[in-house]
Amino acid sequence: LSMGTGTSVAKEASDITLLDDSFNSIATAVMWGRSLYKNIQRFIVFQLTINLVALSSVLLGAIFGTELPLTVTQMLWVNLIMDTFAAMALASIPPSMDVMKEKPRKASDFIITPSMLKNIVGVGVAFLALLMGFIIYMNNMPTDVLPMALTQFFTLFVMLQFWNMFNASVF
């Protein structure tokens, strides 16, 4: 570590040079780094939950004997449109001084913590239960209203993912 006003030999020997000669820059950089790491974790929670629910609903929908509850086009729309905007929203959460109160993590720690895993599985199972309940309800409908019911299923799936995004943002 060297200061910006230090000698050129010190600057060349150091890994980091503080151009403004302020040690507060180190604390600010740590805060931004921890906040970025937390935002990445938030996106992982969002992404794994949405994919767990989507894949499980297609699999269980096939087991229940319905048409594909989510078509390839709908899955593509979810992955391209919803995930892109969710990534921007979750990545733009500003840093908070609260991250400085957390203990430093080990470099060997896995990015998915046990509480994140519980959140992913818990929310995923809850969403899946709602969607499977709707599929069972759809199976009792006349076949002429099935396209409308599949549209309602997709709308319910998208609305649950909006809730998932807000859930991930407060994680």
Annotate each language-model stretch with its function:
Residues 4-171:
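Membrane-embedded transport module
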